[in-house]
Amino acid sequence: MRIFNTMTRRKEEFVPLIPGEIKMYVCGPTVYNFFHIGNARTFVVFDTVRRYFEYKGYKVNFVQNFTDIDDKMIKKANDENITVQQLGDRFIDEYYRDADALNIKRATVNPRATLYISKIIEFIQDLIDKGYAYSVDGDVYFNAKKFNNYGKLSGQNIEQLQSGARIDIDERKKNPMDFAVWKSEKKGEPSWESPWGMGRPGWHIECSCMAYNILGETIDIHAGGSDLKFPHHENEIAQSEGRTGKVFAKYWMHSAFVNINNQKMSKSLNNFFTTREILDKYEPDVIRLFMLSGHYRTPINFSIELLDSTKSALDRICNSIINLEELSSKVKNDGILDSEIKYKEHLNSYKQRYIEKMDDDFNTADAISVIFDLIRDINTNIDENSSMEIIKYSLALIRELGSPLGILQKSKRGSIETEVELLIEKRQKARKDKNWALADKIRDDLKDKGIILEDTSDGVRWKRV
């Protein structure tokens, strides 16, 4: 199994620190708003990575934090005249609602930064004692030049970073690239007692501290969106390795952006859709399939048209699953037929192809193609003359390959039938209103999904093909 390691910029054989176990930390949301579908891609991608590791038999200790204190949260809480904690409580609940709907597994631990303040203070004091941090007027800064390998994740040395980065000018800093690990108290902001006066932690120190206290000095995988590579993850490395003198994470993984009109989707650009908005219109399986239809290190473009196309593709899979479910309730051949023994072995070849794709840096795009190939094969070769065993095996295999992707686990029978009946009613109304264009479009859309309508003297009948 090979993983692309951002640190080395190449695919590497995955070897866990402890055989059979994986310690994985993923940077989670700042809980001041609903998360958008750019965030959702990151969460779905690393949920899939976790699921695939578990499919392979690993025990995964999966930690994803909540940033519940930062500048954006303070501003929004003040704007709404509520406390930062109240704001955090609200949007943590909203996160779980949307993440659960997307079939994202709950983390082993979801730590909140504000519950680790005493540990963060200990961490900072240790950095000061080791000469990696210094206090100035109640603020504490990390001395970036003190850490010899600063910039190794982003592939730049500190001189390049200083000349190319937009840096806040602060004459109190020893070096321009130094960053705050503790911020002194300001009016209207939450604050905690510390050896340096009242204040609050910086963003980067929170993740270093939570990873250290929950997972230990060295973890297997640290992951997040590609926008976190610098400065957030770079600073985490400096803090964590500065404190322990040990490698912070063996593998670094980063997921690419979701773009709209070839521009990164983000709250700052105000060009985003919240996950909640999309969940109101599309099933979770559609959204997950869309998110995983490209390789996780490649940006994907978002549009309603692409989601509709993904929905049509998923409908074809669901129709095949429904056909198998219906066949399993009709056939009378219990044992496997002699002619089906080799076919069962043939079906197993799809599983091997799927594993090969996923073992190659979680290539979900190619793994999904294997599932579609499997569906076409089953549609061609399995019918009412097949045995119960081969029908159930085919159905189980489809669901098995869907499981690491977090899709195809629920029966679609009732939901598909309800949707078809509603569209037939809509078409009937269009015909009554002589809106022939809409009536024809509904018929053609259903045909694209594998549903054929038959207008008879007794009304409209439909069947799957």
UniProtKB/Swiss-Prot annotation:
It is an enzyme of class 6 (ligase). Zn(2+) binds at C27, C207, H232, E236. It catalyses: tRNA(Cys) + L-cysteine + ATP = L-cysteinyl-tRNA(Cys) + AMP + diphosphate. It holds the Pfam family DALR_2. ATP binds at K267. A motif ('KMSKS' region) lies at residues 264-268. Its cofactor is Zn(2+). GO terms for biological process: cysteinyl-tRNA aminoacylation. Binds 1 zinc ion per subunit. A motif ('HIGH' region) lies at residues 29-39. It comes from the Bacteria. One of its GO terms (molecular function) is cysteine-tRNA ligase activity. Its EC number is 6.1.1.16. Belongs to the class-I aminoacyl-tRNA synthetase family. Monomer. This is Cysteine--tRNA ligase. The gene is cysS.
